A protein has these predicted regions:
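Extracellular loop and loop/strand-boundary signature of outer-membrane beta-barrel proteins
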Residues: 52-58, 93-98, 141-148, 193-199, ...
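Outer-membrane beta-barrel "beta-signal"
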Residues: 275-288
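Transmembrane beta-strand segments of Gram-negative outer membrane beta-barrel proteins
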Residues: 32-48, 79-81
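Membrane-embedded beta-strand positions of outer-membrane beta-barrel proteins
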Residues: 40-42, 83, 124, 160, ...
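Residue-level signature of outer-membrane beta-barrel architecture
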Residues: 70-74, 114, 164-166, 211-215, ...
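Outer-membrane pore/translocation modules
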Residues: 99-206
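Transmembrane beta-strands of outer-membrane beta-barrel pores
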Residues: 44-50, 76-78, 87-93, 128-134, ...
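Repeated loop/turn-to-beta-strand initiation elements of outer-membrane beta-barrel proteins
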Residues: 78-81, 119-122, 169-172, 217-223, ...
């Protein structure tokens, strides 16, 4: 499992390595524009299928998803304060199964950078990841089992270090950080080494690395990728990896096709690498 995680990380790093030279060719002649800038993009997807006396068979189905992706940045001559927020929620109903959750995302990040040089600068950052609604597992026999809910679990980090940004499309940072996990009922913060008690919170110091790449592949096609790595001092050989990759193609002014692949490797939560893939077409609107 550890070797597989290293292979996944290596592939993502190679993507960054080949993409950066192309990004470096973009126009940098424009001068800086200071002040607040905001961007908010909302996406709505929906699918409905209904059968009446259909001889070939089939199941009635209804699925919907709502996503909001925003950024707010305050750029000043000596500092840059970047904030990002990603929210998503979706449900589906297939036949008589009832409504089930298919997407649930609550992701906040804030980073303050002090400008000391053109490419290398110190930073301080904080993140929060959780979900909106309860999550369930559905065994083949028996009732559904609740396995998560709002702020259970909640993952938070605070870090400080150095950020390197050679071009506008790519940046990577490395630093020291704290990582907290909160879990009141479902044991996500429990330490398996203490068998006699169940911890509801954990705090670990460690090393953080975050790399982000945003590319305009075509006039209507964009690619974004974010790789987050955290290794605690207690288990320095166990790298917690989160990878979020999206290709979006604008079919028309308000219709977008999007492919998103998320990878998560955290041995304390699951012994295997978790993979989530979403292919959706729906309405997309840029608010700001």
């Amino acid at each position: 499992m550890y070797n597989r995680s290293i292979q996944i990380i290596a592939v993502i790093v190679l993507i960054f390595a080949f993409a950066i030279p192309g990004a470096a060719q973009t126009d940098t002649a424009k001068g800086p524009v200071y002040g607040w800038t905001h961007s908010v993009i909302g996406t709505l997807t929906a699918t409905q299928v209904a059968f009446t006396d259909w001889a070939q068979g089939g199941e009635n189905a209804l699925a919907w998803g709502l996503a909001l992706d925003g950024k707010s940045t305050l750029d000043q001559p000596h500092t840059n304060w970047a904030n990002s927020y990603k929210f998503g929620f979706g449900q589906t109903r297939l036949g008589d199964q009832g409504i089930r959750k298919t997407d649930d995302r609550f992701d906040l990040e804030s980073m303050l950078t002090y400008k000391m040089s053109e490419h290398w600068n110190p930073y301080a950052a904080a993140t929060l990841k959780t979900q909106f609604a309860p999550g369930y597992k559905y065994p083949s026999t028996g009732p559904e089992v609740r396995v998560s809910q709002f702020f259970d679990p909640a993952f938070m980090t605070q870090s400080a270090g150095v950020v390197y940004q050679p071009v506008a499309e790519f940046k990577t940072r490395f630093g020291l950080g704290l990582r907290e996990v909160l879990s009141s009922k479902f044991g996500y913060a429990d330490d398996p080494e203490t068998a006699t008690e169940i911890e509801h919170s954990s705090i670990n110091g460690g090393l953080e690395s975050v790399s982000e790449l945003t590319l305009k592949l075509d006039e209507q096609v964009s690619f974004s990728s974010k790789l987050e790595l955290f290794s605690t001092f207690k288990h320095i050989d166990q790298v917690i990896m989160r990878s979020d990759n999206t290709i979006a193609a604008k079919v028309s002014k308000y219709i977008t096709v999007m492919l998103n692949v998320q990878l998560l490797n955290e041995r304390a939560v699951s012994p295997r690498t978790q993979i989530k893939e979403t292919l959706a077409m729906g309405l997309s609107y840029t608010f700001l």
